[in-house]
């Protein structure tokens, strides 16, 4: 069974927010206790964090579906629901987070680096939080907002200073095993190395990391062999070391041709041309290997390569090679821009942008896009007339109706906000009219809704009624005595 996985697809689902509660306080001798519905809890978010003890994406290979906890719903007596627990996933250093279309969302380098991939939904407000001077006992509450749902691709790019490249069976694994404490699998057949191996090299004041990747063959940059899958592991390397087999049995191969073939693959892959190179002519302990190394060395040096004749078996020439790698790594680190100190700034969550746009769509439909309008629609219970009326008030105060009118929308046009569609009625007056709890008189049938004249007459009748009752209570006399 494989123990190394460097690419997985994750299906992430953040927690949904809990619904707000509709409740009215009931207690003896308190006939008007008022609303006491609590707010729903926020859903849990999904984050990635770099852990130094994790070296592979194997866990996600077997569990690709991840979901955070939902927020709990509110309850009466002003009891707020509990927030859903945030889910933190541990990933190796050097993990790249990409969206489904290949867009890089984050490059996680450095222990403790954290990235929030999916944010939990906001909890809905209970009717106690929605009460105001005019709407003293709301008969509705907000729904919890759904959490983010996203598919991401995680790719591991090993974080190493020196990358060992070369043909299969060139001796890369043997070399890394003697210059570091790494224990890769070593055998006398090609493609023994199937996963990258990392080792830490210490020589005097130099300490650096070396990566041994599977052997490359012509066409690796286009997918042949194992090169395409593992070439990304040397993208972060500051130095590349060509490991060349001087004792190869294939008569048609020679060290110069091997280096030319590997260089062609590195150029085809892209992004590796500017890295400094070293050449290690390996297996010079073999007589034929020593003779071949002496023949090709002048040609390689004429091309600008620093060449070292080494033997992983006898450890000949390894000291000079490690010093050269350490010097190049130190120079690369000095040339790199200084890392800015990390400042931890605690800020509240950003307030939703109040901006929105109104666009005409085919078929006489108008589309309203904006953070606030879309969130308000998601949190509205459309089975409750009073909640729908509250949504109409909020959209009107935000200026949605005014902007629709200026854009040319007509009564009865279809308006889409988020995933909901509405028939626009600009004549609906936007003032809360108290009525039955859970209802809104503005949404009643037109024949049932009293006109302004009828409402004025009703108010006059209510004022006149106490005067009529007072006159009826006056005693009636029998005349003069």
From Swiss-Prot:
Cellular component, GO annotation: cytoplasm
Name of this chain's protein: GTPase Obg
Region of interest (Disordered), ranges: 439-481
EC number of this enzyme: 3.6.5.-
OBG-type G domain boundaries: 160-330
Role: An essential GTPase which binds GTP, GDP and possibly (p)ppGpp with moderate affinity, with high nucleotide exchange rates and a fairly low GTP hydrolysis rate. Plays a role in control of the cell cycle, stress response, ribosome biogenesis and in those bacteria that undergo differentiation, in morphogenesis control.
Predominant localisation class: cytoplasm
Binding site for Mg(2+): 173, 193
UniProt cofactor(s): Mg(2+)
Enzyme class, broadest EC rank: hydrolase
GO biological process, one term: ribosome biogenesis
Subunit structure: Monomer.
Signal peptide range in chain numbering: none
Biased composition (Acidic residues): 468-481
């Amino acid at each position: 069974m494989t123990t190394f996985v460097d690419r997985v697809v994750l299906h992430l689902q953040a927690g949904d927010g809990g619904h707000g509660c509709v409740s009215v306080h009931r207690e003896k001798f308190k006939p008007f206790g008022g609303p006491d519905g609590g707010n729903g809890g926020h859903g849990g978010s999904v984050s990635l964090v770099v852990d130094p003890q994790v070296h592979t994406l194997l866990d996600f290979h077997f569990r690709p579906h991840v979901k955070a906890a939902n927020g709990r719903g509110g309850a009466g007596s002003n009891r707020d629901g509990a927030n859903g627990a945030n889910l933190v996933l541990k990933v190796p250093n050097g993990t790249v987070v990409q969206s489904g279309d290949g867009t890089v969302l984050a490059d996680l380098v450095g222990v403790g680096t954290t990235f929030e991939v999916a944010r939990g939904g906001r909890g809905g407000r209970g009717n106690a939080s929605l009460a105001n001077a005019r709407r003293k006992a709301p008969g509705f509450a907000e729904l919890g907002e759904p959490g983010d749902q996203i598919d991401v691709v995680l790719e591991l790019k090993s974080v190493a200073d020196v990358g060992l490249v070369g043909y299969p069976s060139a001796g890369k694994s043997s070399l890394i095993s003697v210059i570091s404490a790494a224990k890769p699998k070593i055998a006398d057949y090609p493609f023994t190395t199937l996963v990258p191996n990392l080792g830490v090299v210490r020589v005097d004041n130099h300490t650096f990391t070396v990566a041994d990747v599977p052997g490359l063959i012509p066409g690796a940059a286009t997918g042949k062999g194992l090169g395409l899958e593992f070439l990304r592991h040397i993208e972060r390397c500051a130095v590349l070391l060509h490991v060349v087999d001087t004792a190869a049995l294939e008569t048609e191969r020679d060290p110069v041709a091997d280096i030319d073939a590997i260089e062609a693959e590195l150029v085809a892959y892209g992004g590796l041309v500017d890295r400094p190179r070293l050449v290690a002519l390996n297996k010079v302990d073999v007589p034929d290997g020593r003779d071949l190394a002496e023949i090709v060395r002048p040609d390689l040096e004429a091309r600008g390569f620093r060449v070292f004749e080494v033997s992983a078996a006898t450890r000949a020439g390894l000291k000079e090679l490690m010093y050269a790698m350490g010097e190049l790594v130190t120079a690369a680190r000095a040339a790199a821009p200084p890392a800015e100190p990390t400042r931890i700034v605690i800020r509240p969550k950003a307030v939703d942008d109040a901006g929105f746009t109104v666009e005409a769509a085919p078929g006489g439909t108008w589309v309203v896009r904006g953070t606030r309008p879309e969130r308000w629609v998601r949190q509205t219970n459309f089975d409750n007339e009073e909640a729908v009326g509250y949504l109409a008030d909020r959209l009107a105060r935000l200026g949605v109706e005014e902007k629709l009118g200026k854009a040319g929308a007509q009564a009865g046009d279809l308006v889409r906000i988020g995933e909901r569609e509405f028939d626009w009625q600009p004549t609906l007056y936007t003032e809360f009219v108290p009525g039955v709890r859970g209802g809104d008189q503005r949404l009643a049938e037109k024949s049932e809704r009293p006109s302004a004249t009828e409402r004025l007459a009703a108010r006059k009748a209510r004022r006149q009624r106490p005067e009529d009752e007072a006159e009826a209570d006056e005693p009636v006399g029998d005349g003069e005595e």
